[in-house]
From Swiss-Prot:
Cofactor: Ca(2+)
Annotated organism of origin: Schizosaccharomyces pombe (strain 972 / ATCC 24843) (Fission yeast)
Active site: residue positions: D221 (nucleophile), E245 (proton donor)
Residues that hold substrate according to the record: W99, H138, R219, K224, H225, G249, H312, R360
Protein name according to UniProt: Uncharacterized glycosyl hydrolase C27E2.01
Length: 491
C-alpha cells in the first residue's frame, strides 16, 4: 500500500475533544498582544510603536474587557505568558513573548500569577473564553556569542536541542522540524521534541498550566516546525481545544497536520482573500475554487479552522488597500465563511501598519473608540453571527452553499443567512448585479442587516429567485424578516 493511500491513524485528543470543538465553533476570537493592548494606568498617550516593551499588562486587559465585550467577541487569545530573554537585541526586546528562556516562570513584564488568574476569572464571569499562545518548538538566544545553556529552564543542556543549523528550505518538512529558526541576531534553538524526556515535561507542563489558570484553549506557535507525532498526547494532556500555526497556503499541506492537531490557522483562506481583495488580483470565481472547493477536497473540517484577515505576522489590510468597500467585504467574509473568525487587535480601529513591528502598534492611541465606523460595522456583524450561533440549528456545523459566483460577486448561504460579497471596489463601474435561486418556493421577505434594504424572492416552478445590485460594491447580509425581528427583540 502506498503511503498516500494508507488509512490515517485516529488519535485521541482528550476526553472532551468533541465537546471542545463544538464550544469553539461558536466563538468569535479577539487576538491580543499583551504588551500592546492596554496599560495599567489607562494612559492613551504613551509610546505605541517599535520593538521594545511598551507596558501592556494582563491587568490592563482586565480593565478593557468591557471594550472587547462591547465589540461582541466571545473569546480572547493572549500572547505567550512565559519568561522571555531580557535585554535589547538587534531585533529589539521580547515584548511579543515568542523568545522563551524559562518555561517555568511567568513574564514579569505582563504581571503576576494573581493578575493572570484574575484575567481568566473575569473572562469566565462574562461567559467568555481564554486561549493562550504557547511555543513548544524553541527557546531563544540573542547574538552570536556562545550559548549559556544553564540559564534555560527546563532545557538547560545542549542535548535538549538539535545541532545549530539555520533553516533555509521552508518546504522541506524534515528540515523544518530539526533546523533552527531565526539567525545570528536572535537564534531560536530548536528543541528535541521527539525525545521522551521532552515529551514528558511538556505533557506535565501543559496539564499543570491548564489546571492552574483554567485556560480554555491553546494556540500553538510554529506548529509545522515540530514533529507531528508530538501533538496528540500533548493535546490530550491539555484536554482543551487547540489550533496550530501551520504557515502554509496549500490546504493539502494543512490537512496533513489536522490528523495530529484539532485545528489550524486558515492560511490557505488568508492567501486567497489577500489575492482577491488586497487589492484584487484574481476573480471571485477563482476565489471560490481555491479557497472553498480545494479546501473541501481535502480531509479538513473547515468549520473548526481559525479564519483571519490580519494578525501579528502579516501587514494590515489598510496598508495595502484603502478601499473601504473592499475592507467591509473582507470582514463580512471573515465573519460568515465556514470556520471560527479571529479579529486582531486594532483591526476594529482601522489600523494600517505594514510588516512587523508596524502591524503591532499599541491600541491605546485609538482611545478605544467604539464609534469608529469599522468597530460599529464589526459589532453589527458579530451580533448577527452570535444570534445565528445561538438560535439557528446547524449554523456552526453545516458548510456554506454557493448560490452565485462570477468575476466580481460571490453569494453563499449558511443556515439563517445569505451573504453577498464583491471585490469590485467602491470606485469601480463594473457590473455587480446578482440573481440567484433559493430552495424555498414561496415568496419570502429578506432584510439586509447592513443597510436595512428589503428584498423579496420571486417564486418559480421549483424555487424562488432574488435579484439585486451592490451599491458601491458594498456587501449585503440577508436574513429572513421574521428572524431579523426576532434578533432585534432579543437585543
Amino acid at each position: 500500500m502506498s503511503l498516500d493511500k494508507q488509512i490515517p491513524i485516529i488519535y485521541d485528543f482528550g476526553e472532551n475533544y468533541e465537546k471542545n470543538k463544538d464550544i469553539w465553533r461558536r466563538q468569535c476570537i479577539y487576538q491580543i498582544l499583551t504588551d500592546r493592548f492596554a496599560l495599567d494606568d489607562h494612559c492613551t498617550t504613551a509610546p505605541s510603536t517599535g520593538r521594545m516593551y511598551l507596558g501592556g499588562t494582563w491587568r490592563g486587559i482586565i480593565q478593557k474587557l468591557d471594550y472587547i465585550q462591547s465589540l461582541g467577541c466571545t473569546a480572547v487569545w493572549i500572547s505567550p505568558i512565559v519568561k522571555n530573554i531580557e535585554g535589547v537585541t538587534g531585533y529589539g526586546e521580547a515584548y511579543h513573548g515568542y523568545w522563551a528562556e524559562d518555561l517555568t516562570q511567568l513574564n514579569p513584564h505582563f504581571g503576576t500569577k494573581q493578575d493572570l488568574t484574575e484575567l481568566v476569572d473575569q473572562l469566565h464571569k462574562r461567559n467568555m473564553l481564554c486561549m493562550i499562545d504557547i511555543v513548544v518548538n524553541h527557546m531563544a538566544h540573542a547574538g552570536d556569542s556562545p550559548i549559556d545553556y544553564s540559564k534555560y529552564a527546563p532545557f538547560n543542556s545542549p542535548s535538549h536541542y538539535h545541532p545549530k543549523r539555520f533553516l533555509h528550505n521552508y518546504d522541506d518538512t524534515w528540515d523544518c522540524e530539526i533546523a533552527w529558526l531565526g539567525d545570528e541576531v536572535v537564534s531560536l534553538m530548536d528543541i528535541r521534541t521527539e525525545d521522551q524526556e521532552v515529551h514528558n515535561f511538556f505533557q506535565n507542563w501543559i496539564r499543570d498550566l491548564i489546571q492552574t489558570y483554567h485556560f480554555d484553549g491553546l494556540r500553538i506557535d510554529t506548529a509545522k516546525h515540530v514533529q507531528k507525532e508530538f501533538y496528540p498526547p500533548f493535546i490530550a494532556a491539555a484536554n482543551v481545544f487547540a489550533f496550530g500555526e501551520v504557515y502554509h497556503g496549500d490546504p493539502k499541506f494543512i490537512a496533513k497536520y489536522l490528523e495530529y492537531i484539532p485545528s489550524a490557522a486558515n492560511y490557505p483562506l488568508y492567501y486567497q482573500i489577500e489575492n482577491t481583495f488586497f487589492p484584487p488580483k484574481q476573480s471571485m470565481n477563482i476565489f471560490y475554487q481555491k479557497a472553498i472547493l480545494e479546501a473541501r477536497a481535502t480531509s479538513m473540517d473547515t468549520t473548526i479552522l481559525g479564519n483571519f484577515t490580519e494578525n501579528h505576522d502579516v501587514p494590515r489590510f489598510l496598508n495595502r488597500s484603502t478601499d473601504y468597500s473592499l475592507l467591509c467585504n473582507t470582514l463580512t467574509l471573515l465573519l460568515f465563511t465556514d470556520g471560527i473568525p479571529i479579529i486582531f487587535q486594532g483591526q476594529e480601529q482601522m489600523y494600517a501598519g505594514g510588516h512587523d513591528p508596524e502591524n503591532r502598534d499599541a491600541l491605546w492611541t485609538s482611545n478605544y473608540n467604539q464609534q469608529n465606523p469599522i468597530f460599529q460595522f464589526l459589532k453589527k456583524l458579530i451580533k448577527l453571527r452570535q444570534f445565528l450561533v445561538d438560535n439557528v440549528s446547524g449554523f456552526t456545523t453545516e458548510l456554506s452553499n454557493m448560490l452565485f459566483v462570477n468575476e466580481h460577486v460571490y453569494v453563499f448561504r449558511r443556515p439563517g443567512v445569505i451573504i453577498v460579497v464583491s471585490n469590485a471596489g467602491s470606485n469601480s463601474d463594473v457590473d455587480t448585479s446578482a440573481e440567484f435561486s433559493i430552495t424555498e418556493r414561496e415568496s419570502l421577505e429578506f432584510i439586509d442587516v447592513l443597510s436595512g434594504s428589503q428584498f423579496s424572492s420571486l417564486p418559480t416552478e421549483d424555487s424562488s429567485t432574488i435579484s439585486m445590485n451592490l451599491e458601491f460594491s458594498f456587501p449585503r447580509v440577508l436574513v429572513h424578516r421574521g428572524l431579523f425581528h426576532s434578533m432585534n427583540e432579543l437585543a
